[in-house]
Amino acid sequence: MPNIIRKLVENDKKELKKLNKMALQVESFADEMEHLTDEQLKAKTPELKERIAKGESLDDLLYEAFAVCREAARRVLGLYPFHVQIMGGIVLHNGDVPEMRTGEGKTLTATMPVYLNALSGKGVHVVTVNEYLATRDMTEMGELYSWLGLTVGLNLNSKSPEEKREAYNCDITYSTSAELGFDYLRDNMVTRAEDMVQKPLNYALVDEVDSILVDEARTPLIISGQAESSSALYYRADQFTKTLKGQNLNVATSDYEEGDDYKIDLQSKTISLTEEGIDKAEKFFQIENLYDMENVALTHFVDNALRANFIMLHDIDYMVDENQEVLIIDQFTGRTMPGRRYSDGLHQAIEAKEAVPIQDESKTMASITIQNYFRMYKKLSGMTGTAKTEEEEFREIYNIQITPIPTNRPVQRLDHPDLLYPTLEAKFKAVIDDIKRRHAEGQPILIGTVAVETSELISKKLVEAKIPHEVLNAKNHFREAQIIMNAGQQGAVTIATNMAGRGTDIKLGPGVIDHADPEFRGLAVIGTERHESRRIDNQLRGRSGRQGDPGVSQFYLSLEDELMKRFGSERVSAFLDRMRISGEDAVIKSGLITRQIESSQKRVEGNNYDSRKQVLQYDDVIREQREVIYAQRQEVILTKEDMTPVLMGMFKRTIDRQVDGHELAGNLKDEETVKDLLQTVQNTMLPEEAIELSELTGLSGQAMKDLIFDKVKSRYASQMEKLADPERQLEFQRAVILRVVDNNWSEHIDALDQMRQSVGLRGYAQNNPIVEYQEESYKMYNNMIGAIEFEVTRLMMKAQIQPQTAIRQEAPRMTTTASQENITNVGPDTSVSEEISFENVGRNDPCPCGSGKKFKNCHGRTHIA
């Protein structure tokens, strides 16, 4: 055994020994707690809170608090946490992940660390994969926490801001990861402190932590606003792609065949036009060169149409519902994701392909990755039955250790080696034969599929075989709880995509474990192909054999499965040829085949990890910028102090930039240069009568800066006099700063998003895209800060203040990728109207509209014309 593996095993043993000792100490309180009356046990909560207030740490209280919660669970829920569950709870309190097998009672395990950490009063967030589980767990476990005197809240997408605030103010809050992330983003877009809902992030306990922190981490959370509509171009590009000759991803056997108009890279799932395809495109769109700079936008539409038509598969990647809406199917759970949309125009391209109404494109206004959101918590932990395969990722990205926890009872499930068939047809025939055999014995069967399409194919074959069954996929997920509840009954046959009831127990019915033959005892799990992630396969197996129950699992594979096509089918085919195995019904069991499949899965997992890492690397670049902007917004919203000192700094830096810019462009002794500077100052800072050419002529650069700054201070004082009330002055200052910061920040992150889409091409020039992105984003950030300060100065100086009128400022219409909701933020009761003059603006001056662009590249185009 290599030293590194031996060391890891020894570390696990040491950790388990330590946890075992701590769990015994918790159990030593059992008799004392059992003899307490209900009132005495409930009184332990305020007593423990008082001890925390006097300086004791949560670690000091762990043994007693766990024992209190354990005894309360016995009285309220009728459940008493086992020794191994106490061990798991200690790992969770330490901010790590206990790997506990399916059915080992993770929900009950979580109650002890949740109770202990909630005693601090700083808030605990229990995070689930969907709202159904959040509601269920809050209802079931909330009874325990309420009995112990703690408050429990539920945060759902449908809740109003007031209801959300109430939920977050509870000791314990149940929510989904997406809703937590979106609430954080929304809190940093409001204009009043009272509109914020979240408290500082303290402790998050994530259920199915691998699903949330790993699988969902590839998709950033985005709040967006509407951008320009380009429906006609999407339809035109779609018409073009439908004239092309080639293969779809699901039937492709090689990347490219002679005469094809496009080629597909099966491993990376990317697509590009061949020379023949490019010729067709140039004729179709009547252009000379598809890849000319002036055709960049068209190329973008064509690339999306290619992906939509030949890479994105109906009922696998997405489905169309009865409202003619394209819904994404989560590849890891099989559930649809209402409200989420593919970015960068791909979703619109799919809508064009399916001939359904095309929704407007969106513009990013705020975004954060799952990784960077959860890394903001002071303490983060989670539970799952399948995390060891992603141990490196948890350690590197979240600084979390994985500790395997022993099962309470030995696992009795029989896990058979994979069976490999040459064709899909042969594989499905074997699957149906196995189902018939097991169904005849009354054994409950769960058939796991990767895609909706496969589940419907098997359902059709079972109908032909006259075997009654239930189908659980993205099209009828609303019946999930009911279907899973009956899946363990004698003779039940259930077909399910990967969603197969994560977090829900398949309880075995009467007589299911009594069969004389071990092969037919308990739930039989049949996998119809390997998923690209070993964790998903392990989760499917884990549906059977829960809590020491008997069970059996068997995977059926074919050389035509997608995973086999992408990685390794040629090698396996060659192996079969050498073994002289042929024929439709030929089947092989081999350790070599299993190792080859696991090797393929590791490669896919490696690719997916790299993809998530890259998403994080890009988000890390703007993380510091986001934190600075959000922190400054918070200061502006929460401050009770006059912001004049802050504004004076902005005015001074803006004046310095203007004078320095004109000095670089020309000589300050030159009359034309001074005239240009005067025009800029009069257009953006001061009334014409406040400063004259003669005052600036002959001055040095520093003297000009000092003179203009003195006059700006006087102008500012007169503006503030119109708002005699200090409170209204602060409202006005706050309204201007927030409006300018929000406009510029949303423009900035949208520009960064667009740059990220294109910066990858710089790799062809031997440049590191991440480094290029860092450098460009830093320059853009500095430009944004300059634009913010310029625009704040302009608005403060030029705004026509109407002191008697109070008009609420409303935020723009926005959309989240998970909720498609409108968010209206109400701002200060201050009216700001502005009169912008484009007269006498120098060509190279900043445009008075506040875009940050030069006048000649903005409003100057139309004004000069």
UniProtKB/Swiss-Prot annotation:
Its EC number is 7.4.2.8. GO terms for molecular function: ATP binding; metal ion binding; protein-exporting ATPase activity. It holds the Pfam family P-loop_SecA. Zn(2+) binds at residues 847, 849, 858-859. It is found in: Cell membrane; Cytoplasm. Keywords: ATP-binding, Cell membrane, Cytoplasm, Membrane, Metal-binding, Nucleotide-binding, Protein transport, Translocase, Translocation, Transport, Zinc. NCBIfam families: PRK09200.1 (NF006630), PRK12904.1 (NF009538), secA (TIGR00963). This is Protein translocase subunit SecA.
